[in-house]
Amino acid sequence: MSQTHLSNQKFADLPLHPEVKQALAENGFEFCTPIQALSLPVLLQSKDIAGQAQTGTGKTMAFLVATFNHLLSSSIPEGRQLNQPRAIIMAPTRELAIQIAKDAILLAKHTRLKVGIVYGGESYDVQRKVLDQGVDILIGTTGRIIDYVRQGIINLNAIQAVVLDEADRMFDLGFIKDIRFLFRRMPNADQRLNMLFSATLSMKVQELAYDHMNDPVKVEIAPEEKTSKNIKEEIFYPSQEDKMRLLLTLIEEDWPEKAIVFSNTKHSCENLWSWLEGDGHRVGLLTGDVPQKKRIRILEQFTQGQLDILVATDVAARGLHISDVSHVYNYDLPDDCEDYVHRIGRTGRAGNKGVSVSFACEEYALNLPAIETYINHSIPVSNYDRDALLDDIPSPVKIHRKHPAGARNLRERSGAGRTPGAHRSGGRPPRHDRTRRQP
């Protein structure tokens, strides 16, 4: 294969259930990614897996294919009740759970298996109606799953397959006690297929695996490569005064098809949104306090191309599967080295090329040495000509506090005097090659 992100292993050559093969073929899945090629032969023998793989490697489809195949090839537990799912997939964030559910629905099309999803931020009653009808594969965040288990709405005695995705993130967010609580209410480890995936297989993650899994096979994909070779990284050292002007100038030069701008705080993200919106970009804002329905709407707009730029805190850095992100801008260097890897991992996915641009300003430059040590390479430095930065930038729009993240509503109240999205429809032309020179 000339596409290095795929292996030579075809899904059609694996001993998969016919309905799974049909769904894969209809959705264009022909060749496995490396993590799929390594893990599926093991899982199809009903052996447990502890897999190390970063986001964007295809691990989601690996555990979904294995889960569907296992349920379709196994007998339904005797005496199973309507409130007893046969498989459970746990994710650290609702965004990741939603994406997993979307992929699961693709595989479920030709099967009799029902997929359900539960997570915080949505109505208990709405989700309960789905559960009351019975689900075979339950996908969700641990907190909401535990709520339903404690209420007796869900019973885990018929679980035949378990997936724990992004286990390292589960530790970061303090969910491990919840996970152990759920494991203790399932059949014994040797009576179910167990799958754990993590960006790092640290000692604490491996301990969790061996405590609640049946002698799992360890599968690793290029653990020494923290960042993808498909991502072109660079870093600027702007003054605080130049920082916003530099970002706006670079965006106008790069003209990204789809970009994510990361900042470390909600306040900074809101400020970024205001300037980008005022400059005529189609931009959405995603922070931790955005209501779930609005969050889903913004992500759909970004995915469907109605928005070109997403401004986000690290709530969006993990678990989002958004294709064709061409650029990532780290307006602030993150305090956590792993967050840098997860941020820039939003681009350069599935063999595509991507660009990551970071700013080492006075406030966050001290984070850079630890990041470069963690990723095991220096980030190339780019310089800029201060006199070439944009100087005719419109004023930022003001955020209406009752509607903190709805780009459409905010634009209607901005009074900025420019056509929304003017850059994309014949507005001010981009100023190419005005800021960069060879370092």
Swiss-Prot record:
Segments forming domain Helicase C-terminal: 243-390
Predominant place of localization: cytoplasm
CDD domains membership: DEADc, SF2_C_DEAD
Classification via InterPro entries: DEAD/DEAH_box_helicase_dom, DEAD_box_RNA_helicase, Helicase_ATP-bd, Helicase_C-like, P-loop_NTPase, RNA-helicase_DEAD-box_CS, RNA_helicase_ATP-dep_RhlB, RNA_helicase_DEAD_Q_motif
Annotated GO CC locations: cytosol
Top enzyme category: hydrolase
Basic residues bias: start-end ranges: 425-439
Binding site for ATP: A53, Q54, T55, G56, T57, G58, K59, T60
One Gene Ontology biological process: RNA catabolic process
Superkingdom classification of source: Bacteria
Cell compartments where the protein resides: Cytoplasm
Keywords: ATP-binding, Cytoplasm, Helicase, Hydrolase, Nucleotide-binding, RNA-binding
Motif DEAD box in this chain: 165-168
Catalytic function, reaction form: ATP + H2O = ADP + phosphate + H(+)
Every Helicase ATP-binding domain range: 40-219
Xref: Pfam families: DEAD (PF00270), Helicase_C (PF00271)
EC number: 3.6.4.13
Renumbered residue ranges of the record's region Disordered: 395-439
Molecular function GO labels: ATP binding; ATP hydrolysis activity; RNA binding; RNA helicase activity
Motif (Q motif): 9-37
Gene3D superfamilies: P-loop containing nucleotide triphosphate hydrolases (3.40.50.300)
NCBIfam families registered for this protein in UniProt: PRK04837.1 (NF003419)
Role summary: DEAD-box RNA helicase involved in RNA degradation. Has RNA-dependent ATPase activity and unwinds double-stranded RNA.
HAMAP family listed in its UniProt record: DEAD_helicase_RhlB (MF_00661)
Family to which the UniProt record says this protein belongs: Belongs to the DEAD box helicase family. RhlB subfamily.
Protein name: ATP-dependent RNA helicase RhlB
Organism this protein belongs to: Shewanella oneidensis (strain ATCC 700550 / JCM 31522 / CIP 106686 / LMG 19005 / NCIMB 14063 / MR-1)
Lineage of the species this protein comes from: Bacteria, Pseudomonadati, Pseudomonadota, Gammaproteobacteria, Alteromonadales
